Amino acid sequence: CEYGPSTKPEIHPMVTSILRHFFRNGHKVYVVCLWPDGQFMAEEALDEVAVDEFGLTYGTDYVLLGFRPGNEAVVKGIVSDIRKLYTIDSRGTKVTDIPMMEGINKFEDFDFLFSGSAGFPGSIEWVQFASDPTGVPMSTGTTSIQVNEVMPYVQSGQVQGILAGMPGAAEYEALIGVKGIGTSGMDAQSVAHLVIVLFIVLGNVGYFIERSRKKKDRGY
């Protein structure tokens, strides 16, 4: 997880939808965080989906390894030897005592990567230092601002797909058939856009009425 409270409205709906999709299909989920705030975001998403919705077991169905400082150095460490970088998880449990960590030693032991990214370090570092060198496929969800930075990697095939901002989150919610924050956020955004357009129209009407009145007052 590479996002925090300020970008939660865009990224969090993507992350919860991805988790629903993964768990629905029986996949085990391993979560690491390149941002300190990302750990809190991940805990909230996992509690909401893994615990409350699916009733899954920590350490067997999902694990939160947590945050480590170092930016792209953390990504490189995960690629080469994840057990050297993560000796304990976010709860302080030794990784050797976590059932689903059995057989997990390096990045190539994973089947797929999804990066919920709001900037640096994030999706670009994952593709450059993990996915591309190892061949493990990845996709990403980013803020609307970051889309243009990541799109070249999508177009080249290095990233399998991208969820672009709140519209992307809403589209993915529709895809998996579970409407959530992304959909309601887009509804609110659409209403706000309509209100703005209405004010522009009213402003223009008022301007032309006033101009017409002034012309009449001047006698032409």
What are these regions (language model features)?
Residues 141-220:
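C-terminal functional extensions of proteins
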Residues 1-170:
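Soluble extramembrane regions of membrane proteins in the secretory/endomembrane system
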